Design a protein with these regions (language model features):
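Short glycine-aspartate micro-motif
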Residues: 8-10, 20, 60-64, 184
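Glycine-rich beta-strand-to-loop/alpha-helix junction loops that act as flexible
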Residues: 11-14, 31, 66, 183-192
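A contiguous, well-structured pocket-lining segment that forms one wall/lid of small-molecule binding clefts
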Residues: 114-183, 189-206, 230-236, 251-260
Length: 260
């Protein structure tokens, strides 16, 4: 592809780690300005939601589970509203932290998934309040169970079941609260087959539809960033100078959704 064939450069301006965001923004600006191409910075979390809509959903609740972010989101009053979220650590970071302390290495999520065979379900903290969740106590308790002599298979199974049950519970509460009839999964943790199974069971029992993107679209990817930029510039979103500055704490509900 030639630069002359590119009509827009889109990059993630936040949320995220400052050095990573600035590196991406610098590269995007340099390329866009040198070839006189329009530039837009987009919200990483909203990009996960928008790419999920390509599965066929029209007005869903998004269960967004990644390393740093754990949120249940839905569109209301011209913004994607956060109806519930983690109040301590993201589910993915929690799983990675447990795996690291258990000597399993990084990334922890896929390794936990392979080991989580059960069959015994240990008593671990289940922390849900309304549509908010907390995972740090769960991870600490799981490590204590491992240190006390329980097998890694039993501990990872119990840890995974608890974490995903909490996530599916808040998703179901959001469906009930909003009256929406579609659920979309997003984020790297949504690659987990057990989570996909639990979300599918929950939505079937509730009588709503479940849309799960392919795994290469659940993890962070350039397609979702480009697609959201395309949606925004074709949906009467007015690009300002502020839109091209990185924002480490760029929350989902800070974005004006003009393209719906």
């Amino acid at each position: 592809m030639k630069p002359s064939e590119i009509s827009l450069v889109s990059y993630a301006r936040g949320p995220g780690l400052g050095p990573c965001l600035r590196t991406g923004a610098t590269a995007a600006r340099a390329f866009a300005y040198s070839h006189d191409i329009p530039l837009i910075g987009v919200n990483h979390c909203v990009a996960h939601l928008e790419i999920g809509l390509l599965e066929g959903a029209t007005d869903p609740v998004l269960l967004y589970l990644s390393g740093a972010n754990t949120q249940v989101i839905a569109y209301a009053s011209e913004k994607y509203r956060v109806f519930g979220e983690t109040i301590d650590i993201g589910i993915g970071n929690g799983l990675d932290k447990f795996a690291r302390e258990a000597g399993m290495g990084f990334p922890g999520g896929p390794k936990i998934e392979k080991l989580a065979k059960g069959p015994e379900l240990l008593d671990l903290p289940y922390s849900v309040k309304g549509m908010d969740m907390a995972f740090s106590g769960l991870m600490t308790a799981a490590k204590s169970k491992l240190d006390s002599g329980h097998s890694i298979e039993t501990v990872t199974y119990s840890l995974q079941e608890n974490a995903f049950a909490m996530s599916c519970e808040v998703a179901e509460r959001a469906l009930a609260h909003t009256g929406k009839t579609e659920l979309v999964l997003g984020g790297g943790v949504a690659c987990n087959e057990r989570l996909r199974e639990m979300a599918t069971i929950m939505t079937e029992e509730r009588g709503v539809k479940c849309f799960i993107p392919s795994k290469d679209l659940c993890v962070d990817n350039g397609v979702m960033i480009g697609w959201l930029g395309h949606q925004m510039v074709n949906g009467e979103y007015k690009i300002t100078e502020e839109d091209n500055k990185v924002h480490q704490k760029y929350r989902t509900d800070m974005v004006e959704v003009t393209w719906r």
